[in-house]
């Protein structure tokens, strides 16, 4: 009720405030009208009779409005007084009601506190009663358990007296033996008797065997009557032998034989596992064939890497033995690395030129270059009539022979025109075994074989000027691949702690002096793909080939090289610009 009254008074005061603003605006308007009606704007002389001034105001209307506004103001003042009185009378009533409420609240709080105290007392009394009940219940249970135990364990008086009368004497009990002890002693005696019987039977068997042996030996002995004739016979034989030795003394001669026989396979046992072995007898091997000096070595069709790794292994072995090798200084190594970087940058520029050459203003991709070469190869007239024309990939001049003028280059080899082999010929000659250092640091056994290069068929296409320009670009790509191989070798040597870096780097930069080595990239151009697959490759060669195939060469250049390799064309290059050194005869020695 009180809240509703206070809310109503607040609402009335709000409405009065709004009304006050309206009245103030009306007062301003009425005062304006009054001022306008009082002040004349124009003289009446200027007006035409019967004409109304539009800007003039009605004084009567202005007065009526002002009167009504004054009434509203008076009414507002009365309402304001009523609201103010109502608001003033509320605090006194509110204070009186608040005092009564506080007194009642005090009585209620005191009653609540008293009830809380009584509840706490009741809780304490109840808990005490519950605890006493539990204790009494436990005592009752203990009593019941005691009664049950007494019922089970208590003895009858008559039974107790009878048992006391029949109890055993202490002296008689001491003379008795326990049954467990008696059983254990009996078992032990039985075991001992069985052992004695077994020993006696064994001794009897041994005695019988010994007796049989003695009887057999006695039967095999000579009788005393038989000893005298035997003695007489031996003496007669001895005398006859001595007489023969005296009459014919032995002739001692030196050992001579037309031929001798020696055991080649001897019987041995392994020191670790004691396994029987049949191995050859070590010793000097007698050669049955005359020793002839070998022919001069030729350059190998295998890459330089096999020789370089073998040279690194030999250098490390010689260093372990104590021999001294010249070391490459850091300046030479830096110059070599700088030259390597310059060649690599030049090769990248050439690669870009190749792409622009095939693609025009836009760099050609690998697929574009492959399709372009394929269409050029198919549209070439040599391809259309390749079966009818002769092979002009080699020079038609007959090969010179004899003297130092027979020194030829791989790309200037002459082939007899009257021969037309239909298949590839491979002749293998076995040589000594060699050690090959693998990338994992282990040394593997390899065998040196000699293989002649394959002879191309007559279906190889000819060489054109356009293809010559492409071959020059391919040679530059081959140089890039060679540089990448050198970088891979350098990384592999850095990974092996026992390899010496400076000598190996010097060997990689400078061409090796060993004639039995060649470059993998150049030989892959001169040998057909079928023959190259048939050749055995060492573990180093396989790893290097896999590294070259997975290296960071752009795919378009690699496809260009593969498509151009399928043409199997040869071009005359000056010795200074070639990729290989001149060789004497066919380059055929390979390590695998």
Swiss-Prot record:
PANTHER family: GLUTAMINE-RICH PROTEIN 2. GO terms for cellular component: cytoplasm; nuclear membrane; nucleus; sperm flagellum. Residues 544-567 have a biased composition (Polar residues). The keyword Membrane applies. This is Glutamine-rich protein 2. InterPro entries: DUF4795. It comes from Mus musculus (Mouse). Transmembrane segments: none annotated. Keywords: Cell projection, Cilium, Cytoplasm, Flagellum, Membrane, Nucleus, Repeat. One of its GO terms (biological process) is flagellated sperm motility. It comes from the Eukaryota. It is found in: Nucleus membrane; Nucleus; Cytoplasm; Cell projection, Cilium, Flagellum. Interacts with AKAP3, ODF2 and TSSK4. Interacts with AKAP4. Residues 488-592 are annotated as: Disordered.
């Amino acid at each position: 009720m009180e809240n509703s009254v206070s809310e109503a008074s607040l609402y009335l005061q709000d409405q009065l405030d709004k009304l006050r603003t309206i009245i103030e605006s009306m007062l301003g308007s009425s005062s304006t009208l009054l001022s306008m009606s009082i002040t004349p704007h124009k003289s009446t002389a200027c007006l035409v009779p019967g004409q109304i001034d539009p800007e003039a105001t009605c004084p009567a209307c202005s007065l009526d409005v002002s009167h009504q506004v004054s009434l509203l103001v008076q009414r507002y003042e009365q309402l304001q007084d009523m609201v103010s009185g109502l608001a003033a009378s509320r605090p006194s009533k509110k204070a009186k009601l608040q005092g009564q409420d506080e007194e009642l609240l005090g009585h209620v709080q005191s009653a609540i506190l008293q009830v809380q105290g009584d509840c706490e007392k009741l809780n304490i009394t109840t808990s005490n009663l519950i605890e006493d009940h539990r204790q009494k219940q436990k005592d009752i249970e203990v009593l019941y358990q005691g009664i049950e135990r007494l019922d089970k364990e208590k003895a009858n008086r008559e039974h107790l007296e009878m048992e006391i009368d029949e109890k055993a004497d202490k002296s008689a009990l001491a003379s008795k033996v326990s049954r467990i002890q008696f059983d254990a002693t009996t078992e032990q005696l039985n075991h001992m008797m069985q052992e004695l019987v077994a020993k006696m039977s064994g001794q009897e068997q041994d005695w019988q065997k010994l007796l049989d042996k003695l009887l057999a030996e006695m039967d095999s002995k000579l009788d005393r009557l038989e000893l005298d004739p035997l003695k007489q016979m031996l003496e007669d034989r001895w005398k006859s032998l001595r007489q023969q030795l005296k009459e014919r003394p032995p002739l001692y001669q030196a050992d001579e034989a037309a031929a001798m026989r020696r055991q080649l396979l001897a019987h041995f046992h392994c020191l670790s596992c004691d396994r029987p072995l049949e191995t050859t007898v070590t010793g000097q091997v007698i050669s049955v064939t005359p020793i002839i000096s070998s022919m001069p070595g030729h350059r190998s069709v295998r890459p330089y890497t096999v020789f370089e790794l073998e040279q690194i292994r030999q250098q490390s072995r010689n260093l372990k033995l104590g021999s001294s090798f010249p070391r490459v200084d850091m300046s030479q190594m830096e110059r070599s690395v700088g030259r390597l970087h310059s060649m690599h940058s030049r090769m990248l520029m050439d690669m870009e030129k190749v792409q622009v050459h095939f693609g025009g203003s836009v760099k050609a991709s690998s697929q574009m270059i492959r399709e372009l070469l394929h269409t050029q190869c198919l549209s070439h007239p040599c391809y259309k009539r390749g079966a009818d024309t002769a092979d002009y990939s080699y020079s038609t001049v007959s090969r010179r022979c004899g003297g130092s003028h027979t020194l030829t280059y791989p790309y200037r080899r002459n082939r007899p025109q009257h021969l037309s082999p239909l298949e590839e010929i491979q002749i293998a000659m076995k040589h000594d075994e060699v050690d090959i250092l693998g990338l994992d640091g282990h040394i593997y056994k390899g065998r040196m074989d000699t293989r002649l290069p394959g002879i191309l068929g007559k279906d190889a296409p000819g060489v054109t000027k356009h293809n010559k320009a492409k071959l020059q670009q391919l040679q530059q790509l081959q140089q890039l691949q060679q540089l990448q191989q050198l970088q891979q070798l350098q990384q592999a040597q850095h990974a092996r702690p026992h390899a010496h870096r400076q000598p190996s780097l010097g060997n990689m930069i400078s061409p090796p002096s060993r004639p039995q080595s060649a470059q993998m990239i150049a030989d892959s151009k001169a040998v057909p793909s079928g023959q190259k697959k048939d050749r055995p490759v060492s573990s180093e060669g396989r790893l290097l080939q896999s590294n070259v195939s997975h290296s960071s060469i752009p795919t378009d250049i690699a496809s260009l090289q593969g498509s151009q390799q399928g043409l199997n064309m040869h071009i005359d290059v000056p010795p200074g610009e070639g990729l290989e050194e001149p060789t004497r005869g066919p380059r055929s020695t390979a390590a695998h």
